[in-house]
Amino acid sequence: MSVVASTSPFTLATTPSRGEVLAKYFRGLGDPTRLRILRELGADGELSAGELVRRLGLPQATVSTHLGCLRWCGFVTTRREQRSVIYRIADARVGQLVALAEALLDDNAEHVACCETIDAESA
């Protein structure tokens, strides 16, 4: 890994490998709440943060944290409509990726549900 000289707060001290960044990308999708948000947006196209809070039945702060992660990683994008922030999936391939993962899971759900290695890594 190489050292980056910039002092920007958005610059890493070292450059992660492509594999590390890809794993982080999938961890962004690896949260049940974030997947629920993406499913809701995929079904309806655009939703306000308030509507997502209502549909998910979670505290506003929790939903906002997950939306922030999804936005930062490029999974969703926003626009303002008066006082509301409206969210939508940033790229149709995100929805396709989630749909593909669900289709693959259909063939292997029992094994994935019983996987202790993934649970141990996230603890």
Walk through the language-model features, giving the residues of each:
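Amphipathic alpha-helical dimerization/coiled-coil segments
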Residues: 1-21, 43, 91-123
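N-terminal helix-turn-helix DNA-binding core of bacterial DNA-binding proteins
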Residues: 13-61, 81-94
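A generic local structural motif
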Residues: 22, 72-73
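Alpha-helical residues within the helix-turn-helix
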Residues: 54, 71-72
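A short, surface-exposed loop/turn module that caps and links secondary-structure elements
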Residues: 61-63, 119
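Residues within the DNA-recognition helix of helix-turn-helix
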Residues: 66
